[in-house]
């Protein structure tokens, strides 16, 4: 797999709580220059970012982030507001308290409501795999499939661990047809990226890959 093919799967990400507009601009510029799938940024920057890229790049943002325990109504509003401001893709965090209470019906209904608010925009569902048992992850693969979401996503990157090969293997085995997989959190090498893709991920959330590619390009004058 060529580096360009890896980059096309990347949501180039900056979600730091202290992110400044110049830092966001750099993320956007790099994402456009390297033709990544999107740039994933805080919702407060979406409107300005959408105007800045002027349709040249998909803008992704997060809702219910990073803990997921805001109400469904609040998440629906966040989704609608983000889309109105120019977001193309939404990454939502599920309410893990519902999962731990065994209330998967509530999780599914919340995702359905947010998908309806998304309309034809892409919805990715963050399940925070590092906080799940294997059985819970398998159950959530079914929940996300039934809900109509476009992607199941491993991690926020703000919890105890990010994506693992094992979790992506489970997702690939149990998620339904038509639902894609996004691996995110801790992807820090091109080899890891290739492995996640080989295991079934079609989108990668990372802030590091472009830096690695730039370093390699300095050595070889190309990517």
Curated annotation (Swiss-Prot):
EC number: 4.1.2.4
Pfam families registered for this protein in UniProt: DeoC
Localisation: Cytoplasm
Keywords of the record: Cytoplasm, Lyase, Schiff base
Single GO biological process annotation from the record: deoxyribonucleotide catabolic process
Main subcellular location of this protein, as a coarse class: cytoplasm
Active site: 91, 153, 182
GO CC terms: cytoplasm
Enzyme class label: lyase
Keyword hit for Cytoplasm: yes
Pathway(s) annotated for this protein in UniProt: Carbohydrate degradation; 2-deoxy-D-ribose 1-phosphate degradation; D-glyceraldehyde 3-phosphate and acetaldehyde from 2-deoxy-alpha-D-ribose 1-phosphate: step 2/2
InterPro entries: Aldolase_TIM, DeoC, DeoC/FbaB/LacD_aldolase, DeoC_typeI
Reactions it catalyzes: 2-deoxy-D-ribose 5-phosphate = D-glyceraldehyde 3-phosphate + acetaldehyde
UniProt-listed CDD domains: DeoC
SUPFAM superfamilies: Aldolase
Similarity section: Belongs to the DeoC/FbaB aldolase family. DeoC type 1 subfamily.
Job of this protein: Catalyzes a reversible aldol reaction between acetaldehyde and D-glyceraldehyde 3-phosphate to generate 2-deoxy-D-ribose 5-phosphate.
Alphabetical list of PANTHER family matching this protein: DEOXYRIBOSE-PHOSPHATE ALDOLASE
UniProt-recorded name of the protein: Deoxyribose-phosphate aldolase
Species assigned in the record: Streptococcus pyogenes serotype M28 (strain MGAS6180)
């Amino acid at each position: 797999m060529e580096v360009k093919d890896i980059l096309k799967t990347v949501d180039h990400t900056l979600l730091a709580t202290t992110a400044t507009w110049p830092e966001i601009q750099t993320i956007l510029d790099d994402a456009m220059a390297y033709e990544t799938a999107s740039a994933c940024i805080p919702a407060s920057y979406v409107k300005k970012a959408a105007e800045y890229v002027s349709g040249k790049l998909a803008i992704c943002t997060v809702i219910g982030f990073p803990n997921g325990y805001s109400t469904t109504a609040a998440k629906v509003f966040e989704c609608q507001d983000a889309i109105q401001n120019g977001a193309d893709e939404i990454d939502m965090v599920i309410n893990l308290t519902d999962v731990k209470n065994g209330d998967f019906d509530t999780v599914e209904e919340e995702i359905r409501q947010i998908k309806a608010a998304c309309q034809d925009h892409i919805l990715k569902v963050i399940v925070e795999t590092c906080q799940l048992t294997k059985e819970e992850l398998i159950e959530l693969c079914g929940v996300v499939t039934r809900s109509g979401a476009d992607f199941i996503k491993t991690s926020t990157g703000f919890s105890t661990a990010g994506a693992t090969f094992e979790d992506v293997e489970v997702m690939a085995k149990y998620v339904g047809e038509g639902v894609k997989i996004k691996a995110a959190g801790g992807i820090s090498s091109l080899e890891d990226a290739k492995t996640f893709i080989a295991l079934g991920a079609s989108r990668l959330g990372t802030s590091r890959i472009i830096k690695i590619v730039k370093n390699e390009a300095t050595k070889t004058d190309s990517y």
